Amino acid sequence: MCTLANRSFAKMNGIGNEIVVLDLRDDPVAVTAAAARAIASQVPYDQLMVLQPPRAAGTAAFIRIYNNDGSESNACGNGMRCVAKQVFSGTDASALAFESRAGLLQCWRGAAPDIYTVDMGVPKFGWQDIPLAEEFRDTRMIELQIGPIDAPLLHTPSAVSMGNPHAIFWVDDVHAHDLGRFGPLLENHPIFPERANITLAHIVDRTHIVIRTWERGVGLTKACGSAACATAVAAVRLKRAERQVQISLPGGDLTIDWREADDHVLMTGGASFEFEGTLDPALFAGAA
């Protein structure tokens, strides 16, 4: 039987992003895609954050990130704030470092309770890095549309990698389009060989942007931290926003600061604890 049986987990929330944190640092075991899907059947989540023993010196853990369809992701900003809250609760440190498949991540306690800042790293804009299936010299706006050629419903998104691929469509009203219908079509468009997170973004002013996101491997979500980061940097590249902006998502607000000194993207927002539980052994009979 899979040794995940009876392991403790924490159910958490990152401004509407449903997160499960599974701390395996003291007794590590591999988590398969089937096991990740099985866990989602007991406690529904958007992302499963698995803490494994640290690999790099000075880090608190190596983080594996799973979507609820069992696929693995390189980045989840809202999930990282939840991880930070859990790990900070056992220490008086003001800063912690973690490692993921995307590299090293720094986290800090915020000025207010349950507020945390995560360094999401440096965004990538090269078509090979996002990645895209075709060469685009300028990924600030790529050739992609939904709808008739002469009257497209959505068109010319910005493309960005924040450790995972994002496409941001600029619209006047994020609620005027059926993202539940178009999201899966765009997520799986051939232009995105690794699929993509699809975001609708409305620029209110140079310091405030409203977004909705269809999250790769998840679907419609109340919050996607990496999408907020991708939107902020894409707007700056288009000269339509300042380097520090407020991003409003259905689940709440995030502050994104694209630091000019080193191009790192800092994301600040809330994380909350909901409940603890143990994994049902019956889930893993066929998921080992």
Curated annotation (Swiss-Prot):
SUBUNIT field: Homodimer.
Species this chain originates from: Rhodopseudomonas palustris (strain BisA53)
Active site residues according to the UniProt entry: C76, C224
Family to which this protein belongs: Belongs to the diaminopimelate epimerase family.
Catalytic class of the enzyme: isomerase
Gene that encodes the chain: dapF
Lineage: Bacteria, Pseudomonadati, Pseudomonadota, Alphaproteobacteria, Hyphomicrobiales
GO function term, MF aspect, one: diaminopimelate epimerase activity
UniProt-listed Enzyme Commission number(s): 5.1.1.7
Name assigned to this protein: Diaminopimelate epimerase
Keywords from the named record: Amino-acid biosynthesis, Cytoplasm, Isomerase, Lysine biosynthesis
Reactions this protein catalyses: (2S,6S)-2,6-diaminopimelate = meso-2,6-diaminopimelate
One CC-aspect GO term: cytosol
Pathway: Amino-acid biosynthesis; L-lysine biosynthesis via DAP pathway; DL-2,6-diaminopimelate from LL-2,6-diaminopimelate: step 1/1
Binding, substrate: N17, Q47, N67, G77, N78, N164, N197, E215, R216, G225, S226
InterPro entries found in the cross-reference section: DAP_epimerase_AS, DAP_epimerase_DapF
Site entry: Could be important to modulate the pK values of the two catalytic cysteine residues: H166, E215
Function comment: Catalyzes the stereoinversion of LL-2,6-diaminopimelate (L,L-DAP) to meso-diaminopimelate (meso-DAP), a precursor of L-lysine and an essential component of the bacterial peptidoglycan.
Biological process according to GO: lysine biosynthetic process via diaminopimelate
Subcellular location as annotated: Cytoplasm
